[in-house]
Amino acid sequence: MRTVQQLYDDKRDKVIIDIRDKEEYDKETMDSAVQYFWEDMMNDLKMDNISGREKFLNTYSKKVPIYLLCYSGQKSEELEDTLEQMGYEAYSIDGGFVAYLKWKFTQYIKEDENENANEVKDHVKEIERSIVKKFR
């Protein structure tokens, strides 16, 4: 299991699979995530489903880590275990899509704070320049 921040800190090539249903995926998902509904994935990865496993193995390389995104992090944990048993480096995103939304909101706030801090710095510089001009 990994946090959203750990996913973004991982600079390697990776695959993000959103295992929520298509409607939710279409509303919003993580950048570069592909959709693969969890029930379909579970069925494809069953031991007795040779064609499903083959399809998965041909689509997703074991050389690239797979991050799994569900609503809350529970269903993706099950799939994480299955993929690890198959030899994949797989991670469930802790807290799922809810955690992603919280992380995204926090990033917006940080960006806004940085912009405001830069505006204040620029304003202080302007004041300093005007003071210097007056007393030259």
Predicted segments, located by residue:
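Rhodanese-like catalytic fold shared by cysteine-dependent sulfurtransferases
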Residues: M1-Q6, D10-V15, K22-P65, Q74-R136
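Short, surface-exposed ligand- or partner-binding patches at beta-edge/loop junctions that are enriched
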Residues: L68-L69
